[in-house]
């Protein structure tokens, strides 16, 4: 895609599907959670994908208690999401409890950003700015880290894990609320998943 709101999701999907096919993987493990987005709320722990890597929300296996159905045909695979039932708060509390090192982007820092349609994007060579979009230095952090072309920052003073946990507890916006690729349509994530996106 080209233009001001171009998405690079297709560039991520094709290599993923090629690697799964080439290596004949039975599954790929991901960190998606049901609380992130409504299409992911439909996702199973063992999420069936057809021989083209596509997701069909109507063709998912029942999961009763902790019993998972890993039966598949040749060429099909599963995306397995072991932390599917965790929340954003669960993640941050676990990181804090286990003292896990994480990228600095998750903490507040000074960065040049510009606003487009209510989302503050990092000023970067990968972003084509409109003439009226002026980069300003702000104190921000990223609640979710994805492609720079679709991931927005939030204004934040959260410089420690404790600060982040307090901020998440008080937040009124969703973790993916600053992802422009989710705002393309009501079914944007579901459409990407049907095409093979993780």
Q: Language-model segments: what does each one mean?
A:
Residues 1-198:
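Nucleotide-activated chemistry modules centered on ATP-dependent adenylation/adenylyltransferase
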